[in-house]
Design a protein with these regions (language model features):
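Catalytic glycan-binding domains that act on GlcNAc-containing polysaccharides
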Residues: 1-22, 31, 49, 103-122, ...
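TPR-adjacent "capping" and linker segments in tetratricopeptide-repeat scaffold/adaptor proteins
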Residues: 65-80, 108-115, 241-254
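Active-site substrate-binding loop specific to GH73 endo-beta-N-acetylglucosaminidase modules
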Residues: 152, 224-251, 255, 262
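Long, internal scaffold/assembly segments composed of regular secondary structure
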Residues: 250, 260-266, 272-275, 280
């Protein structure tokens, strides 16, 4: 420490008693535990911020597959087996995955849907390796048995069929993905590619309904393409929600809210954002909309993206908040269009300067 000051346990304990909801409370709590003398009462635990459901949009729920009755120990073993399968596929070791599927361990721990999940993943591995017949051989039966739970199995069969010029099969499986998946990005992509398969297969009467499905997700890549092909206008909402006095009053009623407003006033926006991020975890829908307005107006792009995604998981929220343009300028100014830079930052880190990937990439643009 620059002043060589060493905090005493009583100071840390008193601090935790007052500020257990502080963003740095967990670090101070760990330090207090290390400094705690024997037989002293422990410090107050840091506040656990729960994530409340504040969705203002809708995402189609996936059906829950039947589960095999397992003990807690067996569930851990099954999860470990799935991790091993994913690791083998990342390495391209398809033979190792086949051996795992044929093992007594897999038959003992995996349900039918679990086995089909592994078969579909193996099919995806073969597709990535350019072995389309093998991809269909493994993912096809999995899609037939468990496709309603595993739309990714249909996706693998569809892509492999397309590459083999089996357009009728490709269209059928793409349509199955569009019907069963719950991701707007996947649904729009599947519907668009199903339309393309019908176009190549000379079934023009089936194209427009599928493009209309894709066009219903206008914030996705394939949704935008579909809308352009149908001659539809993209109705983006570049405004941000209004900041109402009720939001400020609500923030003033909590310690975290008061701290955040004070920090914004003295220019400590990053620290204020951490306070508001914690507060958003227990905010109701009205307060969450208010926090979105605050984040959009005070240069908090990471919080704005996070809140807009939570409030509108199916899209259709405030595009000005979901695709922010923060008041950031690099030394020497921008040499390329700043919209492109911000687009890359949103994709790579969602504007979190402390983002770190498992591969070691760091920062806003996830540089290695």
């Amino acid at each position: 420490h620059p002043t060589k000051y060493r905090s005493q346990y009583k100071e840390l304990k008193d601090w935790m008693a007052k500020y257990a909801d502080h963003p740095r409370a967990r670090q101070l709590y760990k330090l207090a535990l290390r400094r705690k003398p024997a037989r002293w009462r422990g410090p107050k635990s840091p506040y656990r911020w729960a994530i409340m459901g504040i969705s203002g949009g809708s995402v189609k729920a996936m059906p829950k597959p039947p589960r095999k009755r397992l003990s807690s120990s067996q569930r851990r073993q099954a999860a470990q087996l799935k991790r091993r399968i994913r690791w083998h596929l990342r390495k391209g070791w398809t033979k190792a995955v086949k051996q795992t599927l044929q093992s007594t361990e897999a038959r003992r721990l995996f349900s039918t849907v679990d086995m089909d999940w592994a078969r579909a993943r193996l099919g995806g591995g073969y597709f990535a390796a350019g072995r389309d017949e093998w991809a269909i051989k493994w993912a096809g039966p999995a899609a037939k048995r468990s496709g309603r739970y595993l739309p990714q199995a249909h996706w693998t069969v569809a892509m492999a069929s397309w590459r083999m010029h089996r357009y009728s099969d490709a269209a059928k499986h793409f349509e199955a993905v569009a019907k069963r998946d719950n991701s707007p990005w996947v649904i729009s992509a599947a519907a668009f590619w199903a339309a393309r398969a019908h176009l190549v297969n000379r079934h023009p009467e089936r194209i427009t309904p599928l493009l209309e499905i894709a066009a219903g997700y206008g914030r996705t890549f394939y949704g935008m393409l579909a809308r352009r092909m149908l001659g539809l206008v993209n109705d983006f909402r570049w405004e941000t929600p209004d900041l109402k006095p009720a939001t400020i009053n609500a923030l003033l009623k909590s310690a975290a809210g008061r701290r955040s407003l004070a920090l914004v006033q003295i220019g400590e926006v990053r620290r204020a954002e951490r306070e508001l991020r914690n507060l958003s975890g227990r905010a109701n829908s009205a307060l969450a909309h208010g926090l979105l307005a605050v984040a959009s107006r005070t240069n908090m792009p990471a919080l704005a993206v996070r809140l807009d995604t939570r409030l509108f998981p199916g899209g259709g929220g405030y595009d000005g908040a979901s695709y922010p343009a923060p008041h950031w300028t690099p030394p020497g100014g921008f040499r390329v269009d700043k919209a492109l830079i911000f687009a890359l930052i949103r994709q790579e880190s969602r504007f979190n300067p402390r983002a770190k990937s498992s591969a070691g990439a760091r920062g806003l643009m996830q540089l290695m």
